[in-house]
Amino acid sequence: MACEPQMDPGGAAGPLPTSSPGWSPLPGGSPPGWGQELRSGQVLTVLRIDNTCAPISFDLGAAEEQLQTWGIQVPADQYRSLAESALLEPQVRRYIIYNSRPMRLAFAVVFYVVVWANIYSTSQMFALGNHWAGVLLVTLAATSLTLTLVVIFERHQRKANTNTDLRLTAANGALLRHRVLLGVTDTVEGCQSVIQLWFVYFDLETCAQFLSDHIREMKMSQESLLRSRLSQLCVVMETGVSPTANEGPENLLEETPLLPDRPGSTEKPLMQTELRQLVPEAEPEEMAQQLLAVFGGYYTRLLVTSQLPQALGTRHMDSPRIPCPCQLIEAYILGTECCPFLTR
């Protein structure tokens, strides 16, 4: 089983499905042609690693070399720890495996079998006349419920995922000034779960300017709506606390154990949960930058998987059918959409 990142000799990822309408990834490992310029939404490179191996790490050195062929100087040390700590923790890797499409399909199959068996066993308590007609009705009922579950799964995948997309906030915040966005997707090849880290070029200056103007306008005319939407942009985080932080000297003497700890015994650190705001109140320019950093990974995932909502017009993209990040944030994050956009 190969546990090395799957890269081609030029440093870019191997062949990947990229069928998003209106854009096409640049050839990996090939320098830009004469007069060719990078366009917003262009895929620069993709790193692929086998999620079933341990330990694993992204070959960010190869990504750095690939970005240099496009004239983008981004030292890997600026975001290495941010990207790897966000995506390669054991609990995150397990979540990616259990949230993969084959696992959802397997769950749907098990759900269908269980529902069919329960409905059929219940129907035997009543006289339904023709046996085959009863079996057909049971099958139709189980199929409709399973299809409903599949639709729920698909709608769930179109929302911003706090366990993957939003964990790239710090890394994207460091890469915004380099005009690069990171996004993560997963796929299954054979029996291997593969994590794909996408590097996408995007000039976000105009998007940041539009969002700052939009936030400034909302503060003057729709402040209650702005506060309501931003209050939903929060995550629950666990932080370590010191048990002696809020205790005085007299309490320390009372709490001191009389017997020494047993050798080799380790006490679990005290943890507390806190609700952290993703976009705190600040100047409109700072809030706009933070919104782009928070939802940059979400936008990139929708872009490379062709799941972005169709737009009648675009502000800062070459394709008229693909919305730019500020359009997505304006409509689905700061807008009046009633459906939640974060998955917990």
From Swiss-Prot:
GO CC field: plasma membrane
Function: Stabilizes cell surface expression of ITGAM and participates in the adhesion and migration of phagocytes during bacterial clearance.
The protein's name in its UniProt record: Transmembrane protein 268
Originating gene: TMEM268
Compositionally biased residues, Low complexity: 14-27, 247-259
UniProt cross-references to InterPro entries, sorted A to Z: DUF4481 (IPR028054)
Keyword Transport assigned: no
UniProt region (Disordered), positions on chain: 1-31, 244-266
Quaternary structure and interacting proteins, as annotated: Interacts with ITGAM; this interaction inhibits ITGAM degradation via the endosome-lysosome pathway. Interacts with ITGB4; this interaction prevents ITGB4 degradation.
Record flagged with keyword Transmembrane helix: yes
Alphabetized UniProt keyword annotations: Cell membrane, Membrane, Transmembrane, Transmembrane helix
Membrane topology: Multi-pass membrane protein
Transmembrane segments: 106-126, 133-153
Superkingdom of the organism of origin: Eukaryota
